[in-house]
């Protein structure tokens, strides 16, 4: 566990904590986290996860803007529920993206193509949902983190294992807080 990996994980934890609070500073701290994490993931030969960090970078810029100006009349975006039709489409898209990513990654020197494909596809959807402040992003993050903790333990990436364990707790907390925010704004 390198000091660089620890700092990257720390920025990730701060970013997610701030997200649970709907604090706009979650996005700039995310930019630092994903920039640093991409280097570590590249060294671990988790290539889809490296690409995912690039996606997170772009969505962090998008989310920063959306949270500030994505609401009605360019106001602050409020927590909302996803429409069922969109939710169903996202499930189908996630399944296709997982299969497609797995197919591509299985033909590369990726160290864990299936798990990397799952992380990639599901995280893309969850991050976009978070940028749009859909409360349902949090149970998706809970599921991802339940997979990530044992995975990073198995590959001896202990800083990221700890990060994802903390993310799991934060995702549960964020889910509760965003649901309360949704009820309060109704």
Residue ranges and their predicted role:
Residues 7, 49-58, 164-165:
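Individual alpha-helical transmembrane segments in multi-pass integral membrane proteins
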Residues 54-71:
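Membrane-water interface of transmembrane alpha-helices
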Residues 39-40, 44-46, 56-59, 74-80:
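Interfacial loop at the N-terminal end of multi-pass membrane proteins
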Residues 1-22, 26, 33, 67-72, ...:
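Polytopic alpha-helical membrane-helix bundles and their juxtamembrane interface segments
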Residues 22-25, 37-52:
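Helix-loop junctions on the outward
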């Amino acid at each position: 566990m390198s000091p660089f990996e620890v700092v990257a994980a720390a920025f990730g934890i701060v970013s997610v904590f701030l997200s649970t609070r709907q604090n706009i500073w979650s996005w700039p701290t995310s930019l630092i986290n994903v920039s640093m994490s991409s280097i570590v993931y590249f060294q671990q030969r988790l290539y889809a996860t490296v690409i995912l960090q690039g996606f997170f970078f772009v969505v962090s810029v998008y989310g920063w803007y959306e949270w500030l100006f994505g609401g009605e009349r360019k106001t602050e975006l409020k927590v909302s529920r996803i429409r069922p039709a969109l939710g169903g489409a996202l499930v189908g898209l996630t399944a296709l993206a997982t299969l497609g990513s797995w197919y591509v990654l299985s033909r590369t020197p990726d160290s864990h193509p299936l798990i990397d494909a799952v992380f990639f596809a599901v995280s893309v959807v969850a991050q976009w949902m978070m940028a749009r402040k859909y409360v349902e992003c949090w149970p998706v993050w809970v599921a991802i983190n339940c997979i990530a903790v044992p995975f990073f333990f198995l590959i001896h990436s202990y800083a990221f294992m700890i990060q994802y364990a903390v993310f799991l707790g934060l995702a549960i907390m964020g889910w509760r807080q965003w649901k309360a925010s949704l009820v309060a704004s109704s």
